């Protein structure tokens, strides 16, 4: 059996999958998690979400810093709210969700942005799962849109 020759190291490549002659990436400005949560709530409000709640969970959980919980009256509205959040955060904060769930069914959409987790639920699901009560030990506030 012949052994494959080892590929010599290329010192001009400092990072995997990045060529030495590639232009440096622009510096990203990171938005803090509270501002990101407020941007999410504002995007939910753009699509007429009901009872938008922001819950600070960073002191009680390592899962995220903020939970944003919003209501939609139909599966179409739940999907529209979730799309509004995705579009707004991509354009204004330059972030994409790490994971998305429930967009096809439209009864409970979940968008995970790492520091901020977004739940958009229909009234039956919101009442049944009662996420506000589950996270009641975190600081909670209702989103009030600016006029």
Region roles according to the model:
Residues 10-59, 73-80, 87, 101-103, ...:
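Long, contiguous binding/interaction regions
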Residues 91-100:
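Active-site phosphate-binding and catalytic loops of NTP-dependent enzymes
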Residues 62:
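P-loop NTPase catalytic core of nucleic-acid-dependent motor ATPases
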